């Protein structure tokens, strides 16, 4: 394979092939459409050759374009190649693949972007795999970032986007269940695909060759199955996080897990203890905000939560002998997850809202269970879990506050609603109503209509309060500390007490919230 030698002066025209053609940079603008790129990358050449373009060194005026006969003609391919599959690739991806192929290298879109495109989903990002090594990739493109050279990854910047381009590689032995001891570059696409986690993620695609499927990924997509590439025990032994990824993909795609893959998960779930909290958090959140958060129950059945969230197992083992419920605390939690929208804070709240029930549970002489004070216990447990999983402080604040107040039965009366909004927070109160609605829908039908009617009434009054702009917090109180200082009040604890008294008065009577009336109220009541 031929590339421009590294370290040559910028702008020099290099002949790495038999022909070198120079074009203005205008003809290779990075924001060109895929069709324009294809036109600019194929030029008539002597002898009927197909002349393809590739970046070398740019002096701001021109780049060197090389020509070569049909690239990689006659390559031997193994496995399934679906010529009928035609995927729509971004212009930047097409350009990168064309440039690499023009210079004698193999290049394909690979992994999740191929999977999602086949399924008609929009990929989050596009990855490219190539036979070129990182330094060869860097020599071909004017703008790159050294993302992870030791793992073979270079990010190519084009059209305002970045695309990770990674050299075919073979992962060495995994000694810690997280990282390979060493990485070896290879010239074999098959060997590169073989190291990937699941068959649906082990497909490659190029516009010229179509779909390359060596391990039955297309068949598993059609059958809606998550299956490991090769021996599942080996795949999970290489990186235990793949155990969580299997369930997460099942939740996101609505797929089942293949029996042999599921069996390996059950056997190797304890190895998840090797995985960092940050990586577990990422996979857990992706599962929770998927269309199937009820897959939490499968994680329990497979022994995953026993390792990463043992508090969930205790909920699954805690009955609720009360007419308000129809299953264990854990079953109720799973049902509640399904009843709330796909939002990280809301789904985390539903997962954690009853974590305190196993500890709070008491049973009376009639056999009925009670969970007095479980809201506060759940808040403390939720905070402990969120910190253990390294969540950010803002998420912890929101989730723990919603958990703390999830069982707060606000009455549908303006004064009560204003006070509740003040206690919970104006930003979180609408979310609290969603939490309470989901909690109610996941309970038994006992008094359900009555509970939902109360929530509807509170929601209606909250909208009216918001539309009228009524004061529900200190920040919208018409009097400030400066006003009190002007009236002779010294800064200190007493000032805070006065402001709190004035706020309480406004929560009872919103018409008091003017500077004049509040100062008069202070003169009468607080001096």
Model-derived features: where do they sit?
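Catalytic cores of the polymerase beta-like nucleotidyltransferase superfamily
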Residues: 1-3, 7, 11-13, 22, ...
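DNA major-groove recognition helices of helix-turn-helix
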Residues: 47
């Amino acid at each position: 394979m031929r590339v421009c030698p590294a370290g040559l002066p910028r702008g020099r025209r290099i002949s790495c092939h038999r022909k070198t053609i120079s074009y203005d940079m205008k003809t290779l603008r990075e924001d060109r459409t895929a069709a324009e790129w294809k036109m600019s990358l194929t030029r008539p050449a002597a002898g009927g050759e197909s002349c393809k373009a590739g970046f070398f060194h740019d002096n701001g005026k021109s780049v060197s374009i090389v020509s070569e006969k049909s690239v990689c003609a006659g390559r031997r391919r193994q496995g399934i190649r679906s010529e009928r599959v035609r995927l729509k690739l971004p212009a930047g991806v097409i350009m990168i693949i064309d440039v690499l192929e023009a210079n004698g290298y193999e290049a394909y879109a690979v992994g999740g972007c191929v999977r999602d495109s086949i399924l008609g989903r929009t990929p989050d990002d596009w990855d490219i795999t190539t036979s070129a090594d990182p330094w060869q990739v860097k020599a071909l493109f004017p703008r790159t970032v050294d993302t992870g050279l030791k793992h073979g990854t270079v990010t190519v910047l084009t059209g305002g986007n970045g695309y990770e381009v990674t050299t075919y590689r073979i992962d060495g032995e995994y000694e810690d269940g997280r990282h390979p001891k060493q990485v070896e570059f290879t010239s074999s696409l098959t060997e590169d695909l073989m190291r990937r986690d699941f068959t649906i993620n082990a497909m490659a695609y190029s516009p010229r060759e179509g779909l390359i499927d060596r391990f039955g990924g297309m068949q598993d997509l059609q059958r809606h199955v998550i299956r490991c590439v090769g021996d599942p025990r080996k795949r999970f032994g290489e990186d235990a996080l793949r155990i969580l990824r299997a369930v997460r993909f099942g939740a996101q795609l609505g797929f089942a897990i293949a029996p042999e893959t599921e069996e390996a998960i059950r056997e190797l779930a304890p190895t998840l203890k090797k995985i960092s909290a940050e990586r577990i958090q990422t996979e857990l959140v992706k599962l929770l905000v998927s269309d199937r958060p009820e897959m939490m129950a499968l994680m329990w059945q497979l022994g995953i939560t026993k390792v990463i969230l043992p508090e969930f197992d205790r909920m699954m083992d805690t009955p609720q002998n009360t007419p308000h419920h129809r299953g264990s605390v854990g079953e109720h939690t799973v049902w509640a997850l399904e009843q709330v929208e796909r939002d990280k804070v809301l789904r985390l709240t539903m997962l954690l809202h009853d974590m305190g029930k196993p500890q709070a549970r008491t049973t009376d002489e009639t056999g009925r269970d009670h969970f007095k004070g479980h809201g506060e216990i759940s808040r403390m447990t939720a905070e402990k879990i969120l910190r253990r999983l390294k969540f950010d402080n803002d998420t912890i604040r929101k989730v723990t506050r919603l958990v703390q107040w999830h069982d707060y039965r606000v009455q549908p009366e303006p004064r009560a609603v204003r006070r509740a909004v003040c206690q919970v927070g104006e930003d979180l109160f609408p979310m609290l109503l969603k939490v309470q609605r989901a909690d109610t829908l996941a309970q038994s039908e006992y008094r359900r209509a009555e509970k939902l009617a109360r929530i509807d009434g509170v929601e209606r009054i909250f909208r009216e309060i918001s539309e009228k702009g009524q004061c529900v917090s200190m920040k919208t109180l018409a009097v400030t500390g400066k006003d009190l200082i002007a009236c002779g009040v010294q800064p200190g604890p007493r000032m805070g007490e006065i402001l709190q008294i004035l706020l309480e008065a406004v929560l009872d009577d919103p018409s008091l919230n003017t500077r004049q009336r509040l100062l008069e109220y202070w003169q009468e009541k607080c001096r």
